[in-house]
């Protein structure tokens, strides 16, 4: 993947300046940052994001969404149960606290309840609306210099299962390609 190092250096400097500015405004008190999501199937991309986030705050909070598919039909149902995702997140050293929520309204209430300084978002949210975008938080957009995404990870698991399981391949070959997600696997399209 091509990486524009000058862009990355500028972005890193901006993030550092945001942290210093908030620290001075808070008169030396801790800077609290947060992110929100369902964090299904923890992978190296998440841990890289959490590590980067922690560099820009004293305390890093994760708001964990139970099941985004229950309110947004564009989202997939999580594979890992809610409480298991909570336990995994709590075991990551860059995360200080995890709070669970079910709806975007609950997330908004959490964001209003806590004294939060910085919101951590992926750069794919640049220019897009998001829950709480009208609140008074600085926003730091993290780069996705890694190639990881949950959808790609799930597709990779499906592909490897298909490749390594002859019985499954035979079963899928009898299914109408447009009737199931199998057409992507049969065509070798394992990416999102």
Where are these regions (language model features)?
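Nucleotidyltransferase catalytic core that binds NTPs
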Residues: 1-192
């Amino acid at each position: 993947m091509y990486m524009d190092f000058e862009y990355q250096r500028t972005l890193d400097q901006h993030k550092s300046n945001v942290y210093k500015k908030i620290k001075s405004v808070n008169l030396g008190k801790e800077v609290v940052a947060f992110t929100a999501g369902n964090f299904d199937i923890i992978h190296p991309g998440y841990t890289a994001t959490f590590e980067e986030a922690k560099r820009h705050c004293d305390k890093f909070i994760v708001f964990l969404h139970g099941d985004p598919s229950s309110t947004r039909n564009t989202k997939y149902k999580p594979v890992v149960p809610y409480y298991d995702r909570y336990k995994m997140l709590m075991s990551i050293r860059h995360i200080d606290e995890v709070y669970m929520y079910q709806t975007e309204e609950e997330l908004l209430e959490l964001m209003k309840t806590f004294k939060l300084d910085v919101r951590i978002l992926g750069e794919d949210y640049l220019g897009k609306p998001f829950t709480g975008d009208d609140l008074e938080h600085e926003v730091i957009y993290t780069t996705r210099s890694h190639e990881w995404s949950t959808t790609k990870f799930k597709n990779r698991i499906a592909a490897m299962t298909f490749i390594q399981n002859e019985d499954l391949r035979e079963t899928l070959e009898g299914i109408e390609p447009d009737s199931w997600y199998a057409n992507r696997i049969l065509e070798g399209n394992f990416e999102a």
